């Protein structure tokens, strides 16, 4: 592998990924991942359409969790002095999760995900909201949707 790269540098040729990894499947290739020829009529995997639900859709389907979210929302709003500013585009679920992120009574929040923070607070008997735990344990609240990451998870310094 290294020998091929040094030879390409000596000869003045540019090395690309296809030279380094010749057996890797490419989308425009007619080879499967095990190196066997596949005709254009055959498909190595069946075409499957996967419908993904958003977190809000999933919560609306679950009546019990929907009621808990509504109760948590009402409880948070009762504690507040005024209406939240700049929350027109935030759903109730996102607002509850943001409230959990910014509430100091559940321990430190920098450098950990919401799930890690919730579990830590549970282990230290800080009584984190069960509603937040149920929301975070839903499949739709995975890392890809960034719901498990806290508000401050990828906090970066401001340049300048």
Swiss-Prot record:
One Pfam short name: DNA_pol_delta_4
Chief location bin: nucleus
Protein's cellular compartments: Nucleus
Region (Disordered): 1-48
GO cellular component, one term: delta DNA polymerase complex
GO BP term, example: DNA-templated DNA replication
GO-annotated molecular function: DNA-directed DNA polymerase activity
Residue ranges, compositional bias (Polar residues): 8-17
InterPro entries reported for this sequence: DNA_pol_delta_4
Keywords: DNA replication, DNA-directed DNA polymerase, Nucleotidyltransferase, Nucleus, Transferase
Homology family: Belongs to the DNA polymerase delta subunit 4 family.
Function as written in the Swiss-Prot or TrEMBL entry: Appears to have a role in the stabilization of the DNA polymerase delta complex.
Known partners and oligomeric status: Heterotetramer that consist of the pol3, cdc1, cdc27 and cdm1 subunits. Interacts with cdc1 and pol3.
Full protein name: DNA polymerase delta subunit 4
């Amino acid at each position: 592998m290294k020998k091929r790269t040094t030879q390409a540098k000596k000869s003045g040729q540019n090395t690309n990924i296809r030279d380094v990894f010749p057996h890797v499947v490419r989308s425009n290739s007619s080879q499967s991942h095990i190196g066997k020829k596949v005709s254009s009529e055959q498909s190595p995997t069946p075409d499957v359409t996967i419908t993904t639900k958003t977190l809000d859709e999933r919560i609306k389907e679950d009546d019990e969790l929907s009621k808990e979210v509504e109760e948590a929302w009402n409880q948070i709003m009762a504690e507040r002095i005024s209406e939240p500013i700049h929350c027109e585009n935030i759903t109730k679920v996102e607002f509850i999760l943001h409230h959990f992120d910014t509430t100091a009574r559940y321990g430190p929040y920098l450098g950990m995900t919401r799930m890690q923070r919730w579990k830590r607070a549970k282990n230290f008997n800080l009584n984190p909201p069960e509603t937040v735990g149920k929301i975070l344990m839903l499949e739709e609240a995975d890392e890809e949707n960034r719901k498990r990451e806290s508000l401050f998870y990828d906090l970066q310094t401001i340049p300048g």
